[in-house]
A protein has these predicted regions:
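Conserved ABC transporter NBD signature motif
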Residues: 58-72
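Helix N-cap at the start of a conserved alpha-helix in ABC-type nucleotide-binding domains
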Residues: 182-184
Length: 254
């Protein structure tokens, strides 16, 4: 079942056209790894999908919630459109490179903030669900600790639990291991592997080629704002058709 469809997505920052017509489909349970050099548009694409950045053109369909970015005044006062964007965002969980936990809240409060104040859940119910999520990511003992008292890996696992707390249809990961010390990377990737095994749909901007090859069922290679190569990881990694993709993977080999 298709849960995400992007057609001709474009994004510019002043005169710099970062996305030049992205087309992408993800089915339920897909793990899509998005690879490419810095500046290719990977993170911008993710941020446009959940409207952290405002696309200039294109159509985004998340589980039947369709927004035509070409015709809409996305930053305007249209209340119906803004409500539609909020509805779309509720279907998407986002995990950032820099964790983005609120430093003045303990981990439990970080996780329950959106369920209580956005979804309208009772605080007690949200806390019980949050504790289960912390157990799922292996840091239940950190529920009442503050982010500054956690390692980078623990903070990112807490951020994954926070993203899961809204029960999203799709998780978006923006280079989730890039800010971690090397010895902490595996604990985060392990959580992501478990989510993949449980059938969570994920789009992952990553430089972790082993994860992309072994966990994903689809890999896309971005270059200069366009998808230049896409397919099953076995094909992309062993027989890429794009010379740029071949060179990128050659330079990333272990």
């Amino acid at each position: 079942m298709k849960v995400l469809e992007i057609n001709q997505l474009e994004k510019s920052f002043e005169d710099n056209k970062v996305l030049k017509g992205i087309n992408l489909i993800a089915d339920k349970g897909d793990v899509v790894s998005i690879i490419g050099s810095s500046g290719s548009g990977k993170s911008t694409m993710l941020r446009c999908i959940n409207f952290l950045e405002t696309p200039n053109k294109g159509v985004i369909n998340v589980c039947g919630e369709v927004i035509d970015c070409s015709q809409a005044n996305l930053d305007g006062p249209d209340k119906e459109l803004q409500s539609q964007i909020i509805t779309l965002r509720k279907k998407l969980g986002m995990v950032f490179q820099s964790f983005n936990l609120w430093s003045h809240m303990n981990i439990l409060d970080n996780i329950t903030e959106a369920p209580v104040h956005v979804l309208g859940k009772e605080k007690e119910v949200a806390e019980q669900e949050a504790l289960k999520l912390l157990q799922q990511v292996g840091i239940e003992e950190k529920a009442y600790a503050y982010p500054a008292h956690l390692s980078g890996g623990q903070q990112q696992r807490a951020a994954i639990a926070r993203a899961l707390a809204i029960n999203p249809e799709i998780l978006l990961f923006d280079e989730p291991t890039s800010s971690l010390d090397p010895e902490l990377v595996d604990e985060v990737l392990s959580v992501m592997r478990n989510l993949a095994e449980q059938g969570m749909t994920m789009l992952v901007v990553t430089h972790e080629m082993e994860f992309a090859r072994k966990v994903s069922n689809k890999v896309i290679f971005l270059h200069d704002g366009l998808i230049e190569e896409e397919g099953h990881p076995d094909t992309v990694f062993t027989n890429p058709q794009s010379e740029r993709c071949r060179n990128f993977l050659f330079n990333r080999r272990d």
